[in-house]
């Protein structure tokens, strides 16, 4: 965190992205509190944003993701020259993961319009999708196997129950 603190000390502006309260910055929260002289802005899509520490905010709950809001800023305020394949990929990953690969939190065509523009910017959508949704760590596979082993099938209801205790989740 020392490197982060050095960057923050030299910042002209701190941008908080994708959370509704500064306390959600975790370990950095205390460090960030020491920089009350640096203006802060919030860009977010969650409900009940705590705006008390920000000089400005863009908080739209009927937007798929904060990444979509960032894309709108980039595309609508003259920053498209900075939208290279790396930045476009990061924005697309944010939209994909916040929407469960476009299965929820879509409030209209805008999300798809933005993603279309991102993909046309040399973004390798199949590769990104594969890395996010088809690549599993050993721990994730072991957890899946453990869960499937604990599954109780209720044939008469065409349903199944998988449950984990808090202790099991922390293993």
Language-model features and meaning:
Residues 24-25, 51, 104, 170:
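Short helix/loop capping segments that flank catalytic or ligand/cofactor-binding pockets
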Residues 35-40:
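A short helix->loop->beta-strand "cap" motif at the edges of active sites that frequently abuts
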């Amino acid at each position: 965190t020392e490197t982060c603190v050095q960057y923050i000390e030299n910042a002209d502006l701190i941008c908080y992205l994708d959370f509704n309260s500064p306390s959600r910055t975790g370990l950095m929260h205390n460090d960030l509190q020491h920089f009350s002289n640096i203006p802060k802005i919030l860009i977010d899509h969650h409900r009940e944003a705590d705006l008390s520490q920000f000089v400005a905010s863009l908080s739209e709950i009927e937007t798929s993701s904060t990444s979509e809001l960032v894309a709108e800023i980039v595309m609508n305020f003259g920053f498209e020259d900075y939208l290279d394949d790396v930045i476009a990929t990061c924005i697309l990953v944010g939209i994909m993961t916040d929407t469960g690969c476009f299965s929820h939190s879509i409030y209209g065509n805008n999300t798809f319009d933005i993603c279309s523009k991102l993909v046309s910017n040399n973004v390798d959508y199949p590769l990104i999708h594969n890395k996010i949704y088809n690549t599993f760590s050993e721990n994730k596979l072991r957890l899946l196997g453990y869960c499937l082993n604990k599954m109780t099938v209720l044939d008469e209801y065409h349903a199944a129950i998988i449950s984990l205790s808090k202790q099991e989740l922390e293993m």
